[in-house]
Amino acid sequence: MANQLQVPKQKLAKPPLAIHTLGDRVLRQGSKQISGINDEVRKLAQQMLQTMYSADGIGLAAPQVGVNKRMIVVDIDPENAARPPLVLINPLIKQFSSDLAVDQEGCLSVPSIYADVRRPERVVATYRDLNGRPVTLEATGLLARCIQHEIDHLDGVLFVDRVENQIALAPQLVEKGFAVRDVQVRA
């Protein structure tokens, strides 16, 4: 089977998976390694991509859809049909740059909340593709940020945990109906 899934980059009226939000315990669990890549894993990747596109996202981790597995999907250019999305199975960041950048992040699991997060500008990640082959990827800019954000989900970390200005974040969370106590500060 080819590494690339054929998933139209479009919104579905009824996405295949529900996205869990801040406060749901599934988002705080560490995820389990995927031991073998089979049709079930490929189907999950396809459904995650469909769900991500339907929610206007650029990344989604399996725990966000209630699946305790180490898999993320990323597409930082969802408007470009020629650029295929990435499916990273058992991803691991092997190297972080010392150069840090602050940029605004949002999350499908914390809808309508945006805040500045400081992250390394460049990372080197390893993962398995949909054929089980090992891949090493050097990423910069938005792609590096997105990969770090999604891998955080695999370890039970949400972007709101990394926000340095928690005082400014708290009123936003309350306004959108989230409990401030659900944030686990790691900034």
From Swiss-Prot:
One BP annotation, GO: co-translational protein modification
Matches recorded under InterPro entries: Peptide_deformylase, Peptide_deformylase_sf
GO molecular function: metal ion binding; peptide deformylase activity
Cofactor: Fe(2+)
Residues of the active site: 150
EC number: 3.5.1.88
Catalytic reaction annotation: N-terminal N-formyl-L-methionyl-[peptide] + H2O = N-terminal L-methionyl-[peptide] + formate
Cofactor note (record): Binds 1 Fe(2+) ion.
Domain of life: Bacteria
Keyword annotations of the record: Hydrolase, Iron, Metal-binding, Protein biosynthesis
Gene3D superfamilies per the UniProt record, alphabetical: Peptide deformylase
Binding site for Fe cation: 107, 149, 153
Primary role: Removes the formyl group from the N-terminal Met of newly synthesized proteins. Requires at least a dipeptide for an efficient rate of reaction. N-terminal L-methionine is a prerequisite for activity but the enzyme has broad specificity at other positions.
NCBIfam families: pept_deformyl, PRK00150.1-3
HAMAP family (alphabetical): Pep_deformylase (MF_00163)
Entry similarity comment: Belongs to the polypeptide deformylase family.
PANTHER family for this protein: PEPTIDE DEFORMYLASE
The protein, known as: Peptide deformylase 2
UniProt gene name: def2
